[in-house]
Regions:
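Beta-propeller-forming repeat regions
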Residues: 1-60, 65-226, 231-300
Length: 300
């Protein structure tokens, strides 16, 4: 194309993003709205786009041509008023990120739908560097979600947090090892927790980070009965970071609770709306407050 102007444009009625490329004489030489961010609501013209969070032009497939890397901010909402772009794409903000790559070839740009699906499904859409690390450099977090054994995790670079690694007898699942750990990719530390049996097979996995972007520090993991049903539940307490509205790193404390049931575990979504945590909270204090939420007396 030579020298062109890159013009992103939003349809404010349907919240769809379109990209235009204009030559020096202002003629549009290429345009597209075939973007991952326009496919968040399958089969719907209306989409949850809020704003274009980041864009980069670089060669992603080593063919000597500049490709386009995009990150958009989308809302979990139902199509209400646009959220102000000062709102950070973080846990609890109602905003999540969508990454995409457009490869330049034969005078046009095209998307590899499989790559777009992978980078968003496995959380590699946090930053331009994260996407570049996956697309261009070949690193991936996919194994964190697809591994079947602890050995497979370790072989791919998963680092166990040894100070929180221990075994517990779970009433419905037997004796399992609680295996928390991290995987470093680009500038991000991805945090996961696994339950592994004595043969080394993964029985269950947890994603405590949720919509947070990076683990800042693991504060504790507790395996105790929280809801009073006689079954050990799991609480994870950590501090996480995300990119603020001005590009600065913001650190927040967060916790997750997973209740043991006959078929496995399910994550609490209600209690977290009532019990908020701060940097001054402790693991034991959170367990006490969580039990009180379920009607346990302090110290019971």
């Amino acid at each position: 194309y030579g020298q062109v102007s890159f013009i992103p444009a939003y349809d404010t009625q349907y919240r769809r993003l379109a990209l235009f490329f204009a030559a020096e004489d202002q003629d549009v030489v290429f345009k597209t709205d075939r973007l991952e961010t326009n496919s968040q609501r399958r089969g719907s013209l209306s989409q949850p786009n809020e704003w274009l969070a980041a864009v980069s032009f670089q060669d992603m497939d080593n063919d000597g041509l500049s490709d386009i890397v995009l990150i958009t901010a989308c809302s979990y909402g139902d199509g209400g008023p646009l959220i102000h772009p000062e709102a950070p794409a973080s846990a609890g903000s109602g905003i999540y990120k969508v990454g995409d790559v457009l490869f330049q070839k034969n005078g046009a740009f095209y998307r590899d739908y499989r790559l777009s699906n992978q980078l968003n499904r496995f959380g590699m859409n946090k930053s331009i560097r994260f996407i570049t690390s996956f697309i261009r450099d070949g690193y991936s977090t996919e194994f964190l979600y697809t591994a079947t054994t602890q050995k497979e995790l370790l072989d791919n670079g998963f680092q166990i947090a040894r100070d929180q690694y221990h075994s517990r007898q779970f009433e419905k699942l037997g004796r399992l090892y609680v295996v928390p750990g991290t995987y470093r990719m680009a500038e991000y530390t991805v945090f996961m927790v696994y339950l592994v049996n004595e043969e080394g097979y993964i029985v269950w996995s947890f994603q405590p980070m949720g919509d947070y972007e990076n683990l800042y520090g693991l504060k504790g993991i507790s395996c105790q009965d929280i809801d009073g049903d006689g079954l050990k539940d799991i609480m994870v307490f950590a501090s996480y970071s995300y990119e603020g509205s001005s590009g600065q790193s913001v650190v927040e404390s967060g916790y997750s609770v997973y209740y043991q049931r006959t078929a496995g575990f399910y994550e609490d979504t209600d209690m977290k709306q009532t019990i908020k945590c701060t940097d001054t909270d402790t693991m034991s204090g959170l367990v006490e407050r969580a039990r009180a939420y379920w009607g346990w007396k302090t110290g019971q």
